[in-house]
Swiss-Prot record:
GO cellular component labels: cytosol; peptidoglycan-based cell wall; plasma membrane
Induction: The expression gradually decreases as growth progresses.
Function: Catalyzes the conversion of 2 pyruvate molecules into acetolactate in the first common step of the biosynthetic pathway of the branched-amino acids such as leucine, isoleucine, and valine.
Keyword Transferase: yes
Domain ACT: 7-82
InterPro entries: Acetalactate_synth_ssu (IPR004789), Acetolactate_synth/TF_NikR_C (IPR027271), Acetolactate_synth_ssu_C (IPR019455), ACT-like_dom_sf (IPR045865), ACT_dom (IPR002912), AHAS_ACT (IPR039557), AHAS_small-like_ACT (IPR054480)
GO molecular function ontology, one term from the record: acetolactate synthase regulator activity
Entry protein name: Putative acetolactate synthase small subunit
Pathway where it operates: Amino-acid biosynthesis; L-isoleucine biosynthesis; L-isoleucine from 2-oxobutanoate: step 1/4; Amino-acid biosynthesis; L-valine biosynthesis; L-valine from pyruvate: step 1/4
Reactions catalysed, as given in the entry: 2 pyruvate + H(+) = (2S)-2-acetolactate + CO2
């Protein structure tokens, strides 16, 4: 059986060293973290980690149990596409001289992305969406020449009233 992609929302205490301990746990077990985003929550003393990892179900259950044993981990929820919304952010610098600029902008607009910087030889594009949308945009922009990409990790929230329970 091949590994599948899992998205974990991990609510943690906002203290020094917590990220290092969580990442070390994945590393010790031989997991490669595909995407990691960490940020503030509505509670000032807590942070949310969104971790995307490829794993079979049994090893993932084991690592989830071990994560729960870490003193600063408050709660872990596995997100799925049906019950959550997820987004990534990409900044893409595309080669675009005066001759190709309008074509690049037209492609960017099809993906509801935004041009956030213009120079004589390039455009910088800001795009948000799921991984599939961002990969499709990159394929469309590839023929123009992609100079640079900076991409965030995935962030994810449960749909509707369901959540990780960060409110005190």
């Amino acid at each position: 059986m091949s590994p599948k992609t899992h998205t974990l929302s991990v609510l943690v205490e906002d203290k020094p060293g917590v990220l290092a301990r969580v990442a070390a746990l994945f590393s010790r077990r031989g997991f490669n973290i595909e995407s990691l985003a960490v940020g503030a929550t509505e509670c000032k003393d807590r942070s949310r980690m969104t971790i995307v990892v490829s794993a079979e179900d049994t090893p993932l259950e084991q690592i989830t149990k071990q994560l729960n044993k870490l003193i600063n981990v408050i709660k872990i929820v596995e997100q799925d596409d049906e019950h959550s919304v997820s987004r990534e952010l990409a900044l893409i610098k595309v080669q675009a001289d005066a001759g190709s600029r309008s074509q690049v902008i037209e492609a960017v607009n099809l993906f509801r992305a935004n041009v956030i910087d213009v120079s004589p030889e390039s455009l910088t594009v800001e795009a948000t969406g799921n991984r599939g949308k961002l990969e499709a945009l990159l394929r469309v922009l590839e023929p123009f020449g992609i100079r640079e990409i900076a991409q965030s990790g995935m962030v994810s929230l449960s749909r509707g009233p369901r959540g990780i329970g960060t409110a005190k």
